[in-house]
């Protein structure tokens, strides 16, 4: 990447982040004014969502960034393998989340809210594999064109629901909508189905490569649990 392009790439990243942060701030302010209890339930779901995303990532993003930067592997093949593995971990994490929330005595509605938002975060962890390729190739402009409209549509939906007085179960769909759109746009930009060719041999090969990353994943999950308890 040329040095003169660095400010432009940084601008793409900051533009996407600031757009989402601004829309999220508006959403939380409106929700807090309507009902602090609703905001508290969303906060509980967000905590679970962060855990699901951490498990879905399993420390593979750093591995992807370094591998893509060195150009040691076929990027699309590796991306497909990692995406498939992350999806498997996401599904397992969601199943565990559903049973844990039941064991904790959450109401059925709150369990659904947690499931919706946690699924969204899990999809974010899966889609981050594609964004790692974008970052390694200096294509933050592609990342911005995916993240910004997804955030605006997803959180915008949530804002409309809050203003319209919709039940919390419908408001909670904002994250799932944002993440599904983001995943769909990423697959479209990739131009192929990343799950093609994914199988047991791919899982076994990646399991060896992810050993060190898995340790950091456990540490991050423990930190989130500790913060939740406090």
Language-model segment annotations:
Residues 10, 14, 132, 136, ...:
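Conserved glycine-rich helix-kink/hinge and helix-boundary motifs of the Major Facilitator Superfamily
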Residues 111-118, 145-192, 208-212:
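Hydrophobic alpha-helical transmembrane segments
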Residues 33-45, 70-81, 91-122, 164-172, ...:
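Membrane-interface helix-capping segments at transmembrane helix termini in multi-pass transporters
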Residues 5-61, 94, 98, 120, ...:
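Signature of the first transmembrane helix
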Residues 55-56, 122-130, 183-185:
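Transmembrane alpha-helical segments that form the membrane-embedded catalytic/substrate-channel core
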Residues 29, 33-36, 62-66, 101-106, ...:
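Transmembrane helix-loop junctions in multipass membrane proteins, especially transporters and channels
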Residues 3-4, 32-38, 50-87, 133-142:
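Transmembrane-helix boundary and interhelical linker motifs in polytopic inner-membrane proteins
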Residues 1-6, 141, 145, 168-169, ...:
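Interhelical loop/hinge segments that connect adjacent transmembrane helices in multipass membrane
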């Amino acid at each position: 990447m040329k040095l003169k392009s660095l400010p432009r790439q940084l601008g793409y990243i900051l533009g996407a982040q600031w757009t989402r942060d601004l829309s999220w701030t508006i959403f939380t302010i409106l929700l807090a004014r309507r009902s602090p209890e609703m905001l508290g339930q969303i906060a509980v779901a967000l905590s679970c969502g962060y855990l699901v995303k951490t498990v879905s990532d399993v420390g593979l993003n750093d591995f992807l960034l370094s591998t893509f930067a060195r150009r040691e592997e076929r990027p699309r093949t590796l991306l497909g393998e990692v995406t498939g593995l992350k999806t498997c971990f996401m599904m397992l994490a969601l199943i565990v989340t559903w049973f844990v929330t039941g064991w904790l005595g959450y109401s059925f509605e709150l369990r659904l809210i947690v499931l919706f938002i946690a699924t969204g975060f899990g999809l974010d962890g899966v889609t981050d594999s594609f964004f790692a390729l974008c970052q390694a190739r200096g294509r933050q402009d592609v990342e911005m064109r995916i993240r910004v409209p997804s955030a605006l549509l997803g959180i915008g939906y949530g804002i409309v629901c809050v203003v319209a007085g919709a039940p919390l179960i419908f408001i909670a769909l904002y994250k799932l909508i944002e993440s599904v759109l983001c995943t769909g746009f990423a697959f479209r930009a990739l131009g192929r189905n990343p799950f093609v060719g994914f199988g047991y041999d791919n899982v076994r090969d990646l399991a060896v490569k992810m050993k060190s990353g898995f340790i950091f994943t456990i540490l991050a999950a423990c930190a989130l649990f500790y913060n939740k308890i406090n």
